[in-house]
Amino acid sequence: MNRDTICVQGGYTPGNGEPRQIPIIQSTTFKYATSEDMGKLFDLEADGYFYSRLQNPTCDMVAKKICELEGGTAAMLTSSGQAANFFALFNICEAGDHIVSSSTIYGGTFNLISVTMKKMGITATFVDPLCSEEELDAAFQPNTKVVFGETIANPALTVLDIEKFAKAAHAHGVPLIVDNTFPTPVNCRPFEWGADIVTHSTTKYMDGHGAVLGGAIVDSGKFDWMAHAEKFPGLCTPDESYHGITYAERFGKEGAFITKATAQLMRDFGSMQSPMNAYMLNLGLESLHVRMQRHCANGMAVAKFLEAHPKVAYVNYCGLESSPYHALAEKYLPNGSCGVVSFGLAGGREAASTCMKELKLAAIETHVAYARNCCLNPASSTHRQMNDEQLAAAGVPAELVRMSCGLESSEDLIADIAQALDKI
C-alpha cells in the first residue's frame, strides 16, 4: 500500500458498525473472567491487555500505522522521543557495553548517551558522519553493542550515510538504530538502506501541531539476535522476571525486540504514551504526507533565499546543491528532506540574537518541525550542556540559528526574514 494511503487508513480497519475514527480506550485496566486467563498474559503466552502502563489498544493502533509506514514488523509508542531513544538503546545495552554514535545528533540524545548512560556503565564513541569506512571501523570495540545516528541531524542537518553505517554495524555483528524524526517515513525509510531499528519523536512532524508529546520505536525484524547470542544476553538468555523466557527464541527476530522493550522496560519505567495523546497523534498522521510536501517546499525556498543573502555566512540544508550532503540527500531523500534550515550570520552570535528578536512570524521556542514557523539558537538552549569542543563536533557553532519552516506562505516567511536581516 502507498504511504499516502497508510497515513490516512493504516493501523485500524473498523468492522461493521464500528467507529470510523480510532476509538480512545481511556482505561487503566481490563477485565478478565478467570485468573488463568490473566495469568497467560503475564507469562507472555497470550495476546491482550491488562494494564495501560505497558500497552493500550489505542496506542497499539497508532503504533501499527507507524510500523506500516516504516515497513517494519513490530512497533510501540512511548511518552516522548527521548524515551524512545533510551528504550531502543537500553533494550540492547547493559553495564560494560559500548555504543558507536554519530557526533551530530540532538543535544538531549547526546547527553543521554554521553552522560546519563555513562552513569549506568555504558560508554560511547562519537564519530563524524562523514568519516571514512576505516575511521568508522576503528571506533568499534569488543564490547560495542549498537550503532546510532539520525537520518537528518538536529540541528546541524547532516545526512547519515545509512548504508555505510549499516555495513559497519553488521560487520561487527550489531544493529543500527536510526532516529528518523526529521524526514519521517514519508521521505525516507531507513530499513530499505540497512537500518535495523528506527525511532521517532512523534512530537515533531508526525503530530505536526505542537499539541502532544510522544515517541515511537519500530523494529525491521531483520536483525538475527540469536546469530550473535553472546553479544545480546538480554534478548538471547532467559529472563528471570518472566520465568526464564528467552525473547529471541520465543518471539523470533520479528518480535523479540519490541516484546522485550514492552514487557520489561515499559513495565519497569512506565514511559507509556496516553491513549488521548495517541488519538491526537493519529489525527496528525492522517495529513503527514500532505504537510511534509509543504514543509519541504518552504524549507527549500527559505534556504535558497538565505544562501543568496550577503549577511548570511553559511546555510545548512541538504537540498541545496552547495551542501556537502547533497549527494546523500539525493540518494536517501529524493522526494525532499524536511522544513528545518540552520544558518550562521556574518556578524556572529550577536547578529543572530538580533535577527531572531526582530522576526515577527518565527517565535523563539524549543520546539521544531511543526505547523508554525519558529527559531532557536541551539548553543544557548538545546545544546547548552555541551562544551565548546562538543559543540564543534556536533556542528553547532555559537552563532547557529535553527529555523523550522512551518506551513505558512513561503513569501511571508522570506519577507519576515528579510526585514529582520535589515535590522542587523
Question: Model-predicted segments: where are they?
Answer:
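Conserved N-terminal alpha-helix of the aminotransferase class I/II PLP-enzyme fold
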Residues: 34-86, 108-116
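Short amphipathic alpha-helical segments
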Residues: 47, 73, 213, 277-281, ...
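N-terminal "arm"/small-domain region of PLP-dependent enzymes with the aminotransferase-like
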Residues: 1-56, 64, 404
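Conserved PLP-enzyme active-site core in the AAT-like
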Residues: 7-13, 75-308
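Short loop segments at secondary-structure junctions
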Residues: 29, 220-223, 345-348
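PLP-dependent enzyme catalytic core of the Aspartate aminotransferase-like
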Residues: 1, 114, 123-124, 138, ...
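Short Gly/Pro-enriched turn/cap motifs at secondary-structure boundaries
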Residues: 14-16, 206, 270, 331-333, ...
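Conserved C-terminal alpha-helix-loop-beta "cap" of PLP-dependent enzymes
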Residues: 292, 300, 304-307, 311-401, ...
